[in-house]
């Protein structure tokens, strides 16, 4: 099992991160990609975000140099209501760094005013393969059932799930138990930690525009959108589609189950 990196940065390493953030306006992702070539041990961008968060908690202002400042700060202090939640800080590095298939991000695409039906969207962090389904309401029982149904038939082994702190995911322990996975929660108001699902939801909104009542979207259309996205070439995959990328990987022998 991968162990999380501890905060033992040298003074020189901290100075490098601080300078690139404040002076050069580099993102944590860019800094992490250049960290080793600058003469330091390799670190992930999530490690740098954690470093920034600890600096903020100590009264520092590094966070003000982030491009997504508004999302990072949030609107108010979060008061959690989900018991036994495991923080994304505990998620293994192999999942953070997109080194394998099976690490999933899940979310809801909701109707106006959060009323009525929603789309349960899930995406594999490495392949960008997605699974979309319709849920009649946001109760924990309904959402849990749809998440388990979709990911049980996705066509490859699921290893981890990461979501936000919405109360619709309060039944996370049941989901994790039924699927045999580890379940993690992103930090409150930290959408940057769930970049894959944020991007997927943006693509969904191109085909099902924001403001659409999901009650009026039939199941067939949702599955058509799913198929379009899974067959859409991606630059990050070397211009392969998620389906094409998965077909080239070992361990995806049940490719026939994948929705094309």
Question: Can you describe what each PLM-predicted range is?
Answer:
Residues 17, 31, 48, 107, ...:
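Mobile genetic element proteins and their domesticated derivatives, centered on retroelements
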Residues 42-96:
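Basic, flexible linker segments flanking DNA-binding modules
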Residues 210-260:
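C-terminal domain-tail junction helix/linker
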Residues 101-111:
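Two-metal-ion RNase H-like nuclease active-site motif
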Residues 1-23, 34:
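Short, basic alpha-helical/linker "hinge" immediately adjacent to a nucleic-acid-recognition surface
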Residues 112-115, 132-155:
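Active-site beta-loop-alpha junctions of metal-dependent nucleic acid enzymes
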Residues 163-165, 170-173, 185-208, 215-226:
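RNase H-like two-metal-ion nuclease catalytic core shared by retroviral integrases
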């Amino acid at each position: 099992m991968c162990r999380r990196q501890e905060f033992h940065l040298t003074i020189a390493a901290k100075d490098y991160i601080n300078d690139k953030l404040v002076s050069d306006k580099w993102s944590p992702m860019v800094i992490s990609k250049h960290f080793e070539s600058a003469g330091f041990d390799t670190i992930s961008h999530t490690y740098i975000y954690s470093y920034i968060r600890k600096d903020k908690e100590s009264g520092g202002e590094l966070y003000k140099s982030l491009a997504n400042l508004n999302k990072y700060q949030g609107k108010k202090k979060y008061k959690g209501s989900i018991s036994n939640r495991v923080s994304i800080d505990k998620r293994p590095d192999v999942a953070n760094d997109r080194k394998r298939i099976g690490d999933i991000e899940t979310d809801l695409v909701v109707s106006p005013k959060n009323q009525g039906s929603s789309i349960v969207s899930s995406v594999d962090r490495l392949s960008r393969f997605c699974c979309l389904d319709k849920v009649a309401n946001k109760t924990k029982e309904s959402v849990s059932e749809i998440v388990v149904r979709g990911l049980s038939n996705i066509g490859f082994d699921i290893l981890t799930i990461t979501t936000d702190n919405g109360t619709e995911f309060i039944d996370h322990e049941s989901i994790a138990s039924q699927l045999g996975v580890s379940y993690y929660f992103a930090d409150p108001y930290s959408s940057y930690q769930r970049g894959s699902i944020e991007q997927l939801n943006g693509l969904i909104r191109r085909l099902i525009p924001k403001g659409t009542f999901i009650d009026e979207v039939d199941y067939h259309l949702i599955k058509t959108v799913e198929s379009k996205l899974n067959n859409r070439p991606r630059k990050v995959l070397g211009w392969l589609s998620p389906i094409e990328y998965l077909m080239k990987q070992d361990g995806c022998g049940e490719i026939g189950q994948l929705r094309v």
